[in-house]
Amino acid sequence: MKARFLLITFVLLQALLLASCGAGGRVGALQSESQSVDLADVEAVSVKIDFGAGDLRVTGGAEKLLEADFTFNVDKLEPAVTYKDGALVVAQPDRRGVPNFLGILNFRNEWDLHLYDEVPMDLTLDVGAGTSNLDLSGLALRRLNFKLGAGESAVDLSGDWERDLVANIDSGAANLTVLLPSNVGVRIIVDRGATLINASGLTKDENVYTNAAYGKSDVTLTLGLQTGIGWVNLEVEDSAAANEYSVTE
């Protein structure tokens, strides 16, 4: 099963890497650039990240709405950043076509995105393939939609949430780890395919997983999880706060 998954993932990853470079894409000199977006006078923002393939990192801690570093060696992978009326889009413009296959061996596409912590945010991510590390624990998220094609991803939703969060993760041929909070209620509804699920620190009732704080805290994180093939690791963060909701005999 594991060998079959790795083979399928490899094939899908290569296909998505090829498609992500666009028609006629060629590996060239390594380029690095930084971009930032100021936060306008808005009460909330929507952020959409459209990433074809490579290595993606998203976290908080920015002084502006966005502080980003991009590294790539295919011209067609140069990202486009737009912002208007509270809507931020960071996108790889051309994800179609098949480039020179030989160049794919030296393919590099790396995005390091820092977002502002304090503004309420609806976040949408569409990731084709590769590795993604999403540390969202410090953001003021209201909604999260994450679509992952193939590869590996770690999503950190731990921390002290001050408002309810509605999240959805849809993964294809991927290995996914989700770190969950211990001191706010968590409810996960799973619609899975040929996926192995490890749920540490959660209680299972058919296709629903909950943590010890569910139904007892003022804030609830609700996660819908759709999976294809691969494995999913659901972990509740280690915290002394978890003991507050633990039942002792």
Positions of predicted regions on the chain:
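Extended beta-solenoid/beta-helix repeat architectures
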Residues: 116-120, 126-129, 136-143, 147-150, ...
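C-terminal motif of bacterial Sec signal peptides marking the signal peptidase cleavage site
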Residues: 18-20
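Post-signal-peptide N-terminal segment of Sec-exported extracytoplasmic proteins
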Residues: 41-65
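Bacterial N-terminal signal peptides that target proteins for export
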Residues: 1-8
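A cross-kingdom signal targeting lumenal/periplasmic-facing segments of multi-pass membrane
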Residues: 94-113, 124-126
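Hydrophobic helical h-region of N-terminal Sec-dependent signal peptides
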Residues: 8-16
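Bacterial signal peptide processing site
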Residues: 22-24
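Short, surface-exposed interaction patches in beta-rich subdomains
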Residues: 31-40, 68-72, 77-82, 87-104, ...
